[in-house]
Amino acid sequence: MSHFEAVIGLEVHVQLGTKSKLFCSCPTTFGTPPNTNICEICAGMPGALPSLNKLAVEYAVKAGLALHCTINTHSFFSRKNYFYPDLPNGYQISQGTHALCTSGYLDLTIKNNNKRIGIHQIHLENDAGKSIHSPHENKSFIDLNRAGVPLIEIVSKPDINTPSEAVAYLKSLHAIVTYLGISDGNMEEGNFRCDANISLRPYNSKHLGTRTEIKNLNSFRNVQRALEFEINRQQDILEDGKTIIQETRLYNSDKDITTPMRDKETAHDYRYFPDPDLVPIYVTIQEIEKWKGEIPELSDSRQKRFVIEWGLAHQDAEILTSSRELADFFEKAVKLYPKPKKIANLIKILLLHMLNEHNITIQQCTMKPEAIAELAAIIDENLISIKIAHDIFEDLFSKQLMPKDYVIKHGLTQISDTKTIDTIVVEVLAENPTEVAAYKNGKTKLLSFFIGQVMKKMQGQANPALVNQALHNILSK
């Protein structure tokens, strides 16, 4: 058993969904040819003066409001000085010392336990470019398309103690920024990534240990695995009586290890000073109130409402509110056919499975809530069985068809004629005398076998309840 407690703080970088960069009008479009979305400001040319993107300020304030921060009406930008090949100015424009949003929090519920994670600050900054390494040519290339893209950095307090808590915190943050519409949160494109600071200390100690930082973690799985490895690594060092080195490390997902990158910098190393080319940011109380009024219902409160208003299980509500678009889809379907539990099951079992199969998001889905609502209705009307619903869903999904028309056109309506069902049941029992004898001798689980055989003969179109009833009636004679 470990004698140490992990202390974790996360710095989450969220790319804001503005069309232009933070200090110029260059587009932020992902995937364009290298060095096409750049200008003199992106490239750090002498004399090129930045001009602040006001929408980025609005998005940062909305994030601060959603995370219960104090919104500072007066903040300013500083230059964070360090050398890196893809940082053309030789400094990053940030708000490390005088942030727009400070002193917030995020409440989590993890395995029925509530925990509050403090937010130290949220500040605006511009992203760096990208280094592209070509081992075959023994060269490195610089793409400045990303240079100047607007970010907010959400800095937590060191209130996180386990990798699972860290992942829960990140998932909740991800839901918030996507619900707000300030970022698409695309982790594969680097639009939501984090650096993790971690140290160990003896249980019940208030003293913080020497920390290491793990850079650029871009998936929830990588955060979990990297923190688990680093906790074990530091624990082994401390138990051997050795000292933790304060350093920056990288996580290698292929080898599932962290490796040293460089010594860990401190604020003094960056020589922060106010940027002389940018005026301070002034935000009025009226602007703050306006933006506050535009914040939608967020995932946490929506999840609670789904449980109370629609009677859903907590787990189902959590799944359905995992994205704003999915929650909207569910509610639109329920308004059309007010059977929330049935709608929820169809979305969970059929729609989400199909999205995974096609590797697309709900935003890319062409199926309409009307189709799910109608599918639920015709199942309840006994027009089709659940099995038929499963069988036809691929076509409904891929071809944007309405269920009732499809079922009638293809002759797939459920058979509820008792005489027809009785006839097929008698045939099935006659074909399986050994199983019938075993059933009558107490092997009642064979009922499922008989149901399956009847459904097979009737191509899945028989009413399952009537098949069950017919089997019971005939077998009891």
Swiss-Prot record:
Annotated GO MF terms: asparaginyl-tRNA synthase (glutamine-hydrolyzing) activity; ATP binding; glutaminyl-tRNA synthase (glutamine-hydrolyzing) activity
EC number: 6.3.5.-
Catalysed reaction, written as an equation: L-glutamyl-tRNA(Gln) + L-glutamine + ATP + H2O = L-glutaminyl-tRNA(Gln) + L-glutamate + ADP + phosphate + H(+); L-aspartyl-tRNA(Asn) + L-glutamine + ATP + H2O = L-asparaginyl-tRNA(Asn) + L-glutamate + ADP + phosphate + 2 H(+)
Superkingdom of the organism of origin: Bacteria
Gene Ontology BP terms: glutaminyl-tRNAGln biosynthesis via transamidation; translation
Pfam families cross-referenced by the UniProt entry: GatB_N (PF02934), GatB_Yqey (PF02637)
Keywords for this protein: ATP-binding, Ligase, Nucleotide-binding, Protein biosynthesis
PROSITE patterns assigned: GATB
HAMAP family recorded: GatB
PANTHER family (alphabetical): GLUTAMYL-TRNA GLN AMIDOTRANSFERASE SUBUNIT B MITOCHONDRIAL AND PROKARYOTIC PET112-RELATED, GLUTAMYL-TRNA(GLN) AMIDOTRANSFERASE SUBUNIT B, MITOCHONDRIAL
Quaternary organization: Heterotrimer of A, B and C subunits.
Family membership noted in the UniProt record: Belongs to the GatB/GatE family. GatB subfamily.
Described function: Allows the formation of correctly charged Asn-tRNA(Asn) or Gln-tRNA(Gln) through the transamidation of misacylated Asp-tRNA(Asn) or Glu-tRNA(Gln) in organisms which lack either or both of asparaginyl-tRNA or glutaminyl-tRNA synthetases. The reaction takes place in the presence of glutamine and ATP through an activated phospho-Asp-tRNA(Asn) or phospho-Glu-tRNA(Gln).
Protein name per Swiss-Prot or TrEMBL: Aspartyl/glutamyl-tRNA(Asn/Gln) amidotransferase subunit B
Originating organism: Lawsonia intracellularis (strain PHE/MN1-00)
Gene: gatB
